[in-house]
């Protein structure tokens, strides 16, 4: 291993921000970029009338709705580290793309709206993090408003999300009486002042919880703070780095993203505590990040990131070695060598050509239709990385088009959107209409909008009487053939060529599973692995 690769890997931090919709995730993303010096002023999704859109929300439909639909990737330097920040779709309808992004990160920052507490989407996302024991940092947001009791919020995280909390900062008041936070580990009080343009050096700090200056600053709140801190230190967990890295304990910070307050502490904790890139599982062996040879996997494909270019970009997480522009790398699924000359790195939709990249970095490869989610790349070794799942869709629609002459454009559009993971596409074994599967209604709206804007196709979606899908497999080819013959009306082939059973209701699925005990019904399937 070269010292250069080892040093670069140690400098890397790759994390995603996860939250329930409207918890303030996109605002926090902007502020992290602002504090790191990566951008000069933060746009916010709420300021729709000003035309100032958030850096990380770039697709038309996102600009119209003010939600993050596609996951963006942003790289910036902070305190001699290179940070790769993946902003995930917060809207509940985009959970599948979010799940996949979580396969490409080494840690996650969970944002909770302190007025609402733990919400449904947060629970789902944390369960995906738990599959890989991803370390989690927690930010309780919106303390400039009236919020719930802080101890109650910690209890809720521990009980519902089943992860122990270690408060690192503690709020002093809330809403109009929000005075700041006490940093438990540093024994410092950071004083809050409202205003979205303040930078970290502009917040006052008072050293020591027993400092007499505090009585003068806020005589009413200081005794309550001291009582609460005594209670917190007796009742909650101390921060422990090993337990954090094992995904068992989360450090908790309090603040107000819109007012830039509490951001600095989060950034510092991610640099200091979050792990550098970790080894990754491949089918043949474990791949270490500081190995000399380059390897990586595709976790997302995004069509038409730039309306001027009409292109598709495959997002690759580097797992080992060093990527250099122009190097030859092997696309293992199709056994083809490609010269990587026009690979890009991201600041949301702003792109720059990559000269080099190391484990933990996310790079974009122009894709003309050959690359699929889950594909692995290396300098030649047959490595297929594992752990990139498709999830069984929960909503289904059949597709028709208003102009039958545009059937080819429809098929091309759905093929591309299916590969990208925007929607799952099933071709029934009997019947002509294609079936689309998604995890939320808004996904269908996005597909309608993108078919119209990018492929010139007006599509109509009708409800399909399908309750759920399961991918099916069987080691006994004869039994599988019997199953196919008996259930042809409920079977379809997905975009990856896999056989799926489309169940009209829960009872039907249960009975079918009982009737065919040798057939395996899968709720997830691995990308790039045929069942």
Swiss-Prot record:
Under the cellular component aspect of Gene Ontology, which terms does the record hold?
cytosol
Q: Which UniProt keywords apply?
A: Cytoplasm, GTP-binding, Nucleotide-binding, Protein biosynthesis
Q: Where in the cell is it found?
A: Cytoplasm
Cross-referenced InterPro entries: EF-G-like_DII (IPR053905), EFG_III/V (IPR035647), G_TR_CS (IPR031157), P-loop_NTPase (IPR027417), PrfC (IPR004548), RF3_C (IPR032090), RF3_dom_3_sf (IPR038467), RF3_GTP-bd (IPR041732)
Stretches assigned to the tr-type G domain: 10-278
Q: Which GO terms describe its molecular function?
A: GTP binding; GTPase activity; translation release factor activity, codon nonspecific; translation release factor activity, codon specific
- Tell me which CDD domains the record gives: RF3, RF3_II, RF3_III
Q: List the disulfide bonds.
A: none
Coarse class of the primary localization is: cytoplasm
List of residues binding GTP = 19-26, 87-91, 141-144
Q: Per its UniProt record, what Gene3D superfamilies does this chain match?
A: P-loop containing nucleotide triphosphate hydrolases, Peptide chain release factor 3, domain III
Name the source's superkingdom.
Bacteria
Record GO biological process: regulation of translational termination
Q: What role does it play?
A: Increases the formation of ribosomal termination complexes and stimulates activities of RF-1 and RF-2. It binds guanine nucleotides and has strong preference for UGA stop codons. It may interact directly with the ribosome. The stimulation of RF-1 and RF-2 is significantly reduced by GTP and GDP, but not by GMP.
UniProt record similarity statement: Belongs to the TRAFAC class translation factor GTPase superfamily. Classic translation factor GTPase family. PrfC subfamily.
The family database entries (HAMAP family) matched by this protein are listed as: Rel_fac_3
Q: What is this protein called?
A: Peptide chain release factor 3
> Which gene is transcribed and translated to give this protein?
prfC
């Amino acid at each position: 291993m070269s010292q250069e690769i080892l040093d670069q890997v140690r400098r890397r931090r790759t994390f995603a921000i996860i939250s329930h919709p409207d918890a303030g995730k996109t605002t926090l993303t902007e502020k992290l970029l602002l504090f790191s010096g990566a951008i000069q002023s933060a746009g916010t999704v709420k300021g729709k009338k000003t035309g100032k859109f958030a850096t990380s929300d770039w697709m038309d439909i996102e600009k119209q709705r003010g939600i993050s639909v596609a996951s963006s990737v942003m790289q910036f330097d902070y305190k001699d580290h290179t940070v790769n920040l993946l902003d995930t779709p917060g809207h509940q309808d985009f959970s599948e793309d979010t799940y996949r992004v979580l396969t490409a990160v080494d840690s996650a920052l969970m944002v909770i709206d302190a007025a609402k507490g733990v919400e449904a989407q947060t629970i789902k996302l944390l369960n995906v993090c738990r599959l890989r024991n991803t370390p989690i940092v927690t930010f309780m947001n919106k303390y400039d408003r009236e919020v719930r009791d802080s101890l109650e919020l910690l209890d809720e995280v521990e009980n519902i999300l089943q992860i122990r909390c270690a408060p690192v900062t503690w709020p002093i008041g809330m809403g109009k009486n929000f005075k700041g936070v006490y940093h438990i580990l540093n024994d410092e009080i950071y004083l809050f002042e409202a205003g979205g343009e303040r930078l970290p050096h502009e917040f006052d700090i008072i050293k020591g919880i027993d400092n007499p200056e505090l009585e003068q600053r806020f005589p009413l709140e200081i005794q309550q703070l001291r009582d609460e801190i005594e209670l917190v230190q007796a009742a909650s967990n101390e921060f422990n780095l090993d337990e954090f890295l094992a995904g068992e304990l989360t450090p908790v910070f309090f603040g107000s993203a819109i007012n830039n307050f509490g951001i600095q502490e989060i950034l510092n904790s991610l640099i200091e505590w979050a792990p550098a890139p970790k080894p990754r599982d491949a089918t043949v062996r474990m791949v270490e990040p500081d190995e000399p040879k380059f390897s990586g996997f595709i976790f997302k494909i995004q069509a038409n990131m730039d309306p001027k270019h009409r292109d598709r970009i495959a997002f690759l997480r580097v797992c080992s070695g060093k990527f250099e522009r122009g190097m030859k790398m092997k696309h293992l699924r199709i056994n083809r060598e490609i010269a990587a000359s026009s690979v890009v790195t991201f600041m949301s939709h702003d792109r720059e050509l990559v000269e080099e990249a190391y484990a933990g970095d996310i790079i974009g490869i122009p894709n003309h239709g050959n690359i699929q989610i889950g594909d692995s790349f290396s300098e030649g070794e047959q490595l297929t990385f594992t752990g990139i799942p498709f999830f069984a869709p929960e909503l289904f629609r059949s597709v028709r088009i208003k102009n039958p002459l545009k059937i080819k454009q429809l098929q091309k559009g759905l093929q591309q959107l299916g590969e990208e993971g925007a929607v799952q596409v099933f071709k029934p074994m009997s019947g002509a209409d294609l079936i689309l599967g998604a995890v939320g209604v808004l996904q269908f709206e996005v597909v309608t909008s993108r078919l119209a804007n990018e492929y010139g196709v007006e599509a109509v979606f009708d409800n399909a009487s399908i309750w759920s899908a399961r991918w099916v497999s069987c080691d006994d080819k004869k039994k599988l053939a019997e199953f196919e013959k008996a259930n042809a009306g409920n079977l379809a082939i997905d975009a990856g060529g896999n056989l799926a059973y489309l169940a009209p209701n829960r009872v039907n699925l249960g009975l079918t599973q009982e009737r065919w005990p040798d057939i395996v019904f899968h709720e997830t399937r691995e990308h790039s692995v045929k069942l």
